[in-house]
Amino acid sequence: FIDRYITFNEVNAEQNVKNTVTSVFLGKMALLVEGYDECALIDAKQYPARGVEEPSSGKVLRGAHDGFIETLVANAALLRRRIRAPQLTLEGHKVSDCSRADVVLCYLENKVDRKLLDEVRQKLAKIDVRSVSMSQESIAEAMMGKKQWWTPFPKVRYTERPDAATACVMEGDIVVLVDNSPAAMILPTHFFDFVQEANDFYFPPLIGTYLRILRIVVFLLTMFITPVWFLLVKDPARTQAGLEFLAIDSDYSVPLLVQLLLAEFIVDLLKLASLNTPDVFSNSFSMLGALVLGDFAVQAHWLVPEVLAYMAFVAIANFAQPSYELGYAFKLLRLMLLLFVGALDWVGLALGCIGIIALLAATKPIVGKGYLYPLCPLDKKALFALLVRKPISRDNT
């Protein structure tokens, strides 16, 4: 009956009632015909979707300006368009009991680490949650378990750029696509993977290397610039030996540590407010935020100009790296260092640095080698490839 009368590509027969009900919930159409003991399941679903457009984050000056959207089929097509090889595998999975989310593992058969792939499959199969309404984040947390909640460092990289996801697949990584999400999840993820981004590969190798080195310097400055400056200006004698430019010229009544913490919270408040501000009021909000954080705060003797200058640098530097999660991890560590320095001076800074190193060493990725790979365990070739943008050759992407 199906072969003779139903002229549709996506159709199959089903006898199991439970499977039929599940398919209907997933959007398929069930055709029941009297006299036949099978049901024809026709995949004619079409969900509302926005068009393919450039993502708001991770923009590039050159290169493709398309991005993933909330439709899984379209995202898979964007990858297939770039990798026209039979080795590209798109492996489908179902996750959660209620939402029955579609998850696709994208990898190259001839490049993927089989042990790594089996580990990802096992973790997906063990996900025991009723719903994954937050898409990738829910899946990532379920795969991590509850043992790593205390570490702020991100264990997953996200990208909304098909070209970046394609490059990761070509290098042997696994890209996880989730329906209803415009971001791809890249596994495995290590700390030094955040050093590189798409712009590095759209410029010559020398410029790409410079951008990576600049990003590493920004990582360090974002975490240490305000704690080290606070440590130096706590004692006026420390800023007399050639460091006079770091000293505070104006008088202040609010303790310096309180000023730094207050500035950190004000910056976060402005970020949160900007997310919920309608576009019509965005210009007014920018002017109000600049006045409150700048002129009024100084005139009211809440903050000294030096605190504003360093916090402005930190706020700008946070946007120089591609991961929001990593930016907030640096922020929490920076607050910890400020409190340690305020309480224990030089000893506090040393203890804070030791604590950060121990935290990095104790952090475990979802799958793969250690979080500090390729530094620990040391892989000189992989470390060099991360720090230096090599020219394109036959063996790399």
Please provide the spans of the model-predicted regions.
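Cytosolic regulatory modules rich in charged/polar residues
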Residues: 1-256, 366-394
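Transmembrane alpha-helix detector for multi-pass membrane proteins
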Residues: 218-234, 249-324, 329-330, 335-341
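Hydrophobic alpha-helical transmembrane segments of membrane transport and translocation systems
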Residues: 305-307, 311-397
